[in-house]
């Protein structure tokens, strides 16, 4: 792979930098604080849209990735993930606001990152807050347009030494499984396809032999199916009936162990933890393993007159993860591989396709060859800080943070000899990548209180740097095919080497002012000024302001005597945030080397000149070609958001909740504009050209209380949003990249919405065919397309918008019950009114799905239309696709709504007398199940609407756990 050359990333007075590292301030102790972010603030004083998630709720999910466990717990935050052992997840807060990276910014103990949260030990988390509106997030400026998630890890508390130990083990199994044809059913369906097409089924070339005839009504009747004993002439590949899902999957196992030690005194606190997590996935050989260690300390070094003058501390974690990832497209490979083929030949080798069977790798062999492709990943992440409190209510804090990661992997290529699939190549690629991110900041805060007036102010500066360096070496032809031997130096064949590096700088100045009058009227002002080396010299700096107001209505005199009203606060905010998530070299004119004369399709793409004029004679062995035009006017994407919210609590806050409305518009979206031919080679360029709108409503409500020893807490949330692309360059809006399938412009429609044909049933009689519009490929049992424009011809003009990826709403419901020492938790999560495009349906409903014959299919084909099964809506089986039934159409757009029982847990806390006998302070045992039940639309034909196609299956987990404290 070639990388661009000649770039630099330099601000006028700093080298280029990475992530903006934030910090957590310690406020004056006389102001009790509840929520923590860039600064801290009383929850009652908040004027922005902030959601808080309890780590104890997340722990019940038994997820490796704490962010994945937040599914359904925050209105307006959509999380999608498959069931892979590493637990990677995609997070979207309040819709999709850009054509580029839509991931939120994570702040861990004040240090920002966009790297994977599956590397973080969720057991170390103390609190999680989600900042959703611009007033809350604008203090993070240029990287906060997609929302901010703040994670604070645990620290020691005053008192005696405390030791906590947590252990759990979980068994995983398939919650939903693809139903595919077995060998006999495959033969039956193939026979029907041949007969429907007027072909001789005994000419199939797969070893199937049919005894069949026509009945008195002229309908074909299958009497018997048989197969040759061996599928190949050599007699080494016996006919089989292989369940390839059973051969390539297993019951998975998750083990998790955590131990922590914490202590604290008036001079300081400390927290240490060790963790281990291992997930053996339900696909054979796939697994994820993590070792983690954390140290958080804080010490007061200088104390004068009971006043802490100097405090130092740190938060550091060291993690080592490793993973074997299931091969790409593996489940599709399993579905398609023919059940008539065995796993092994008679001589113990992996079997493969023979005769007329299509070329596909044996799935079991493919997993075996992939099992050595493990990566290892080391990451150290954290900060050290110095806090000085020289005057009353005046505080200065400086922090240095680092995020360093290193990834290593060898990718092995082993020879393949499986029937007609053969490749003698062997080799190995050794890869390394290093990410280095650092930040330094200095922040001063001042708090003021007099009478009914209370205010605090903050100003700060921050510097960030990020570098990414990678290199890779390949070597071929090894004498010994073992992992111990296959290092690049041992190969004797061709060698290849690649490598590159890049980075960027971010410098920031920011400030914030909060004002509170009489605990009734609240005002907050924020300003951030960012400069990034990713942008052109004419627009390198950006300003991100916000303002928010709050009115605590329940504190007004006219409501003071309303005893049942505990909290009623109206909030309103406006602000701007930015997005700079593009390539570090987007603003540069790029060239790459292209030596010699490269020919493709009869055209020369090299940069050398044929001096001799002999069309391939002497050439100048040098040259560079342009890949990209620079743009000195490139600038930030800017998201402007308005938010109105209402917080309420009644009956001693037993009923509580919040309601939010928001509107946000992103403009100057960064778009990679393809060049036109008349501008010459390499005329593509990054520009600011797009606009997207998102608007929505969020509701969170809860009810809690107790009846004697019985306690309960019921809470639910619902969120809805609408997305629309409002501006794009015409050539991009209509090319299908962001929606429209290249047929219609996506402007005015939700991002990634699609255009296609409308399914109008199955032709079930010749009369229906004759009365329908002219349609190429029309026939009995074939799909009928709707003539939308009424011109009597089915063509491209008969397409409309058929797919919208935006759900009507998402929701979550949490039920917590406790009676004495017993507790019960049940959590439901769901999505309503969302479209999914089922690529899987092309394999379950169409025999000619990929225009490759003899691939296995789904069992739905057993109910395909035929003259004797006239009521079916599944197209008739055919070896051909004359009707182009694979085209994008409503036949493959299905209702992806679902409700999932994410977690159900029963727990028991042992009584104090038993704990004392075990020298324990607390002892709890529990059993739980995850993904126990899924309720989906009756019209959904796939496996799992949450994971509608070929993603790693989401398993059902049964977990046994233990929590003990000393």
Residue ranges and their predicted role:
Residues 167, 274-278, 523-532, 574:
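Transmembrane beta-strand segments that form the barrel wall of outer-membrane beta-barrel proteins
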Residues 1-295, 300-303, 308-316, 326, ...:
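Short, small/polar-rich motifs associated with maturation and membrane association
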Residues 78-81, 138, 554-561, 914-916:
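Active-site phosphate-binding and catalytic loops of NTP-dependent enzymes
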Residues 153, 165, 259-263, 295-299, ...:
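Residues on the lipid-exposed face of transmembrane beta-strands in outer-membrane beta-barrel proteins
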Residues 44, 158-241, 282-292, 296-379, ...:
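Surface-exposed loop/interface segments of Gram-negative outer-membrane beta-barrel transport/assembly proteins
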Residues 260, 713-715, 804-832, 886-935, ...:
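Conserved C-terminal beta-signal and adjacent last beta-strands/turns
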Residues 286-300, 540-550, 921-932:
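Short secondary-structure subsegments characteristic of cysteine-rich extracellular domains
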